[in-house]
């Protein structure tokens, strides 16, 4: 999962 979008 990415930490930021």
Curated annotation (Swiss-Prot):
<dbReference type="GO" id="GO:0005576">
    <property type="term" value="C:extracellular region"/>
</dbReference>
<keyword id="KW-0964">Secreted</keyword>
<protein>
    <recommendedName>
        <fullName>FMRFamide-like neuropeptide</fullName>
    </recommendedName>
</protein>
<comment type="similarity">
    <text>Belongs to the FARP (FMRFamide related peptide) family.</text>
</comment>
<feature type="modified residue" description="Phenylalanine amide">
    <location>
        <position position="5"/>
    </location>
</feature>
<comment type="function">
    <text>May function as a neurotransmitter or modulator.</text>
</comment>
<dbReference type="GO" id="GO:0007218">
    <property type="term" value="P:neuropeptide signaling pathway"/>
</dbReference>
<keyword id="KW-0027">Amidation</keyword>
<keyword id="KW-0527">Neuropeptide</keyword>
């Amino acid at each position: 999962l990415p930490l930021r979008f």
